[in-house]
Design a protein with these regions (language model features):
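Scaffold/interface architecture of coatomer-like assemblies
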Residues: 23-387
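Bacterial N-terminal signal peptides
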Residues: 11-21
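N-terminal secretory signal peptides that target proteins for export/translocation
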Residues: 1-6
Length: 387
């Protein structure tokens, strides 16, 4: 077991994510000796970032929820901040996966442990796929690498069979950062070389207790590293009781004014305030989180992380078990499209909105195609935090 320091990781993940050309020359950063903390740069250091490759998963479903499998690269239109982009790589479920599984092992989820232990065989049989590999990180009061990347199904299943709970902390955001660092060392597919899709699967409560990392920092780096996040939410009573409630207080200030001061360097609007308070549109909350990466974000972090990277969040409730959720995630991963492009014609800094649409020729003569639903990652943010 390798214990991962609570500091670290963000700069390593960011530099690898934003320079895919380097990945062809090296297998990744030199691993530190066990127990050696990675040196952190100053907190106020400015980060210079250039994004040379963007990947987005694309899921297309009809009005009954069935996935559409008949589309090709020419059927998709991609824009980055409104500027059309040229597709460099297109795939439909064929690129092998590099998967990092984050498993909460706090005492808070002890009652779920028998169900979580059964997840290993599902991950190897339905999620990894042919030529897939997986690594496992457990987290509670600490973040531990339980298994490095391996193709060996027996090793992965053994880790799940021997999971044990620890303290009551849930360092979710630190664990996300550690997982992003692992995935950032894996080569991405381009137009002229094969690569791997970077996927993170989180099995946890929608709660963070004790992380040194903020949610927005982890999400921003996941986006820049082209990591797609799927999450299986463990619905514990304690998690629901400790979750920060949405702001539902009545408006007592005059119209056009706000009851609290603005965040430094920002202009207050109804949308920005709703995103900050966790009561607004999911898309606005994602944008707010990556723009204000060092500030706390309200709302369900598992849902925000999945939506912010093009993945999906499945809560365990009623008749949906952990096994059912993982099975659904595996089915989607191996039937979705993946598109890569090199951003051109847009400003480097700031938030980049990714939009995906279908060419008219793709749906010509197809009944009910106007009701098809497209899901992709909404964008990414380049530049230092605004606050």
């Amino acid at each position: 077991m390798n214990r991962l320091p609570a500091s670290r990781l963000l700069f390593a993940a960011l530099s690898l994510a934003s320079a895919p050309s380097l990945l062809a020359q090296t297998s990744g950063p030199i691993a530190p000796q066990p127990g050696t903390a990675i040196q952190q740069p100053p907190r106020d250091a400015k980060i210079g970032v250039s994004v040379s490759l963007v990947n987005t998963p694309i899921t297309v479903r009809d009005n009954k929820g069935n996935m559409i499998h008949t589309l090709d690269a020419k059927d998709f239109q991609i824009t980055d901040n409104g500027v059309p982009q040229r597709v460099l790589h297109f795939d439909m479920g064929g690129d092998p996966l590099s998967l990092v599984v984050l498993v909460e092992t706090s005492s808070r989820v002890a009652t779920f442990l028998p169900q979580i232990s059964k997840a290993g065989i599902l991950i190897t049989q339905t999620v990894m796929g042919a030529n897939g590999e997986a690594g496992i990180i457990g987290f509670n009061d600490a973040v531990d690498k339980l298994q490095g990347f391996t193709h060996n199904a027996d090793k992965i299943e053994s880790v799940f069979d021997h999971l044990q709970t620890g303290g009551s902390g849930t360092k979710l955001y630190d664990a996300m950062t550690a997982g992003i660092e692992m995935l950032s060392s894996q080569p991405q597919p381009t137009s002229d070389q094969p690569g791997r899709r970077r996927v993170m699967l989180i099995i946890a409560e929608a709660t963070d207790i004790g992380s040194g990392t903020q949610f927005g920092e982890a999400l921003r780096h996941a986006q820049l590293a082209n990591v797609t996040i799927y999450s299986v939410g463990l619905s514990t009573t304690r998690a629901q009781l400790q979750a920060e409630p949405r702001d539902t207080t009545p408006q007592v200030t005059p119209p056009g004014t706000f009851g609290t001061p603005p965040m430094p360097g920002t202009v207050q609007t109804p949308d920005t305030e709703a995103a900050r308070l966790g009561s607004g549109d999911l898309g606005q909350a994602i944008i707010w989180a990556v723009k204000h990466a060092k500030d706390k974000v309200k709302g369900n972090p598992l849902e925000l992380a999945a939506a912010g990277t093009g993945g999906a969040h499945l809560a365990t409730f009623k008749d949906r078990s952990i096994e059912t959720a993982i099975d659904q995630i595996g089915g989607e991963l191996h039937a979705q499209y993946s598109v890569s492009y090199a951003p051109t014609g847009t400003n480097a800094d700031g938030y980049h909105e990714i939009k995906v649409s279908l060419a008219k020729s793709a749906t010509k003569g197809v009944k009910d195609s106007k009701d098809w639903k497209i899901r992709n990652r909404p964008g990414y943010y380049v530049g230092p935090p605004e606050s």
